[in-house]
């Protein structure tokens, strides 16, 4: 009887890097293996990058539990380190039993989980003894979530007949080298290191930890919790991949939040600038810094749905450069049919989004300092207390700023005390930022006027208005209670009419392919 050969990567094919979030790994591991990875292996070489497992919410995800365990090590009153580690181990062992059929693969995985959790508890006990945690130790603790998740996903792939290899990226940075700055040369080095580790496994399908290190100053401090996306982006760059895929539990990027706007439509194509604006103003797309790494390398990004793997998704690509680096005018690359390029260039607005839980701070100068000194003092205070401003409008003696209201309360209170020394302080709570985004709105006259007129007709008052010099977004601050109404009004008046002039049908052919650009 012949034994079926496991599926593996074909070295003659181009790479696709697929990043999966923690909830996808937690809820859909078989779908990832069978409907996504195995499907793409027929046309591409595939590398998987996974976040730490979650089940339903990030609040009960592995990363959150690891953060809680770190706090327990520092402050025993928070909880038992041993109990928290056992919860993490038990959760992963149960997942192994639920999703893996082969007893040998299952037992090997459970043994590896136990060894990882013993190591994790040693790190936490060291924190407890020293009563402090360094950035490096914190990274080692948090990175354990990705290690457990990727071991699990590699085992699931093996169980489904895919020759996979777990790759731990937690020590890819040469500790003998000193990096004074995390600049372009550092990220180029990281991309090269990630790619080297992946290509070293030959034709096996690599399952890569989204955590990588050890980054000078700490990965969480320097990159933040979006480090898994960043790892996938750098790996795509290092492999010169044909495409980076970000797999979520939504079909892609919509013209508005479909949970709040029933008529919202899936966007087949969007520029990086538009995606960055939507991310910043409330829509979870992909971090702009992560996106810039891939865009600079001229690699398209595709947002796809694990629950609907055959869906078209949304492609993010730069519309000012082609895949081969030749400069183009400010419209989609000429590799697309002319009618698609023309349609995209004339579409105007792309999407509308809301960012809730906003406060507005109005500061009227007491004129004790000069106009430029007034502004400099405000920004110095914001920097001192690490307060990020979403929107700002200024005049010689007056500044209005919109900030996220759930920032550190202590820092915000201290900042208010210092700001009051500069003049009169007026604070408005319970607000939201409404943003209309579209790179090509500049090509159409009157978008701002139409937006504000429609809000006025709907009896929605505007507290503050802001528009950047790039004209890629028009934002205003409104009452949070009116946010959903405003979303629907603007979508109906400024985005639904565009559906009549949507990207031609050939564009759907582009987004149905496993990659955007063909040779």
From Swiss-Prot:
One of its GO terms (molecular function) is ATP binding. Signal peptide: none annotated. Its EC number is 2.7.2.4. GO terms for cellular component: cytosol. It is an enzyme of class 2 (transferase). It catalyses: L-aspartate + ATP = 4-phospho-L-aspartate + ADP. Residues 436-518 form the ACT domain. The keyword NAD does not apply. Pathway: Amino-acid biosynthesis; L-methionine biosynthesis via de novo pathway; L-homoserine from L-aspartate: step 1/3; Amino-acid biosynthesis; L-threonine biosynthesis; L-threonine from L-aspartate: step 1/5. The modification Phosphothreonine is found at residue 328. The keyword Secreted does not apply. Keywords: Amino-acid biosynthesis, ATP-binding, Kinase, Methionine biosynthesis, Nucleotide-binding, Phosphoprotein, Repeat, Threonine biosynthesis, Transferase. GO terms for biological process: 'de novo' L-methionine biosynthetic process; homoserine biosynthetic process; lysine biosynthetic process via diaminopimelate; threonine biosynthetic process. The modification Phosphoserine is found at residue 326. NCBIfam families: asp_kinases (TIGR00657). Belongs to the aspartokinase family. Phosphorylates aspartate, the first step in the biosynthesis of amino acids that derive from aspartate (the aspartate family of amino acids), including methioinine and threonine, the latter of which is a precursor to isoleucine. This is Aspartokinase. It comes from Schizosaccharomyces pombe (strain 972 / ATCC 24843). The gene is hom3.
